[in-house]
Amino acid sequence: MAGTAATVFRNVRPYGAERPVDLFAVDGVLAERLPDGAEPVVVEGGGRIALPTLVDAHIHPDKTAWGEPWYSRRPAASLPEYVEGDVDLHHHLATPLAERAHRLLAHAVASGTRAVRAHVDVAPAYGLAGVTGLAEARERLAGALDVQLVAFPQHGVRRTPGAGELLAEAAASGLIDAVGGIDPAGFDGGPDGEGPAQLDLVFGLAERHGLRLDVHLHDVGARGLDPLRDIVARTRAAGLAGRVVVSHAFCVPEISGDRLAALADELAEAGVGLTTVAPSAHQVLPFRELQARGVRVGLGSDGVRDSWSPYGNADMLHRAHLLGWTTDARTDQELADCFALAADGGADLLDLPRVTLRPGSPADFMLVAGECLPQVVVDLPARELVVRGGRVVARDGRHLG
């Protein structure tokens, strides 16, 4: 059929099924069969496992030194010290931000990622260089990777003169998808820990410009829980259900039982989602309990090879593996849950359709060697083929763009 893009992926095993099947991709969507007259491209799967490509719900590609000469990090013990390190690294790196971000995100594609939510620093130290640089990288990767941009006031708005104005400029630029925030009662709070000023600003910008909102919340105890409940109340009042996310939320793993259930019900009713980067056993979100009560939860990479840490690789299958490690996942179902958070959790947060590998699903998947899904989460096999919209976009760990 003229004008129809059709591909047959022969001999693949969706989710590690025992019997191989053929997957038919027609105009970017999986179909039950090919249309009459189609002249498909044929790709041999060789009995490999087909798995949905993944969604990175929280990454900082503007800060990365991925692919750069080794950078020796200085010790840092507080958030202000880490922020100073960001500025130092930004001035230390010769490669333009747009190129570094593209390099990292192309690697993410080759690792099996189909979409990211990218937090980009907006501060007087950089102006809007991060926003424009990531917008350039996003354009270069169009068709292989969806990129949602968050204008993130890493340096704070109360504590950093001019940051609020830059955030407003970013919101009006048409380049971003969401406005960010950071620790409104702690790092960016007033002398007594009050934080309404920042939330007034970011909620106002989100409403005025029709943007989403994604707030970093590292604070624990009341300094974390009180702003979290304030965000829930503001989300309800503004009618922003499904458009607000709180990242990290380290205060949530501190509570359990009835307190956790009550908070989860508040989050679910207001439509406020959460993201975790599985940083440690005591800071990872209790995602199963949250999801069981209707809370949307996503998984992300966070910083990758930046001034904060020499670690990270923008590989969401590896992040699912780390989630399994930090939550002590041992059974097949527990390991599959970790993969599902990387595949479906982020898709739900970013309002993307889930990949089911059934007819009607986006033709977004990767082919890997292995026996079954739980083994893949543990063994981390090479991503031999990555498919986006029915088109091969990466092969053997290399983006083909």
Specify the residue positions occupied by each region the protein language model found.
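His/Asp/Glu-enriched, well-ordered alpha-helical/loop segment
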Residues: 233-244, 288-370
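N-terminal metal-binding scaffold of metallo-dependent hydrolase/deaminase domains
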Residues: 1-38, 373
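C-terminal cap of metal-dependent C-N hydrolases
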Residues: 359-401
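Alpha-helical scaffold segments that flank or form the walls of functional sites
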Residues: 67-119, 125-140, 168-172
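Active-site gating loops and adjacent loop-to-helix segments of metal-dependent hydrolytic enzymes
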Residues: 64-97, 209, 227-245, 263-266, ...
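Histidine/acidic residue-rich metal-binding segments in metalloenzymes
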Residues: 39, 129-143, 160-245, 249-272, ...
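Divalent metal-coordination and catalytic microenvironments
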Residues: 12, 28, 47, 58, ...
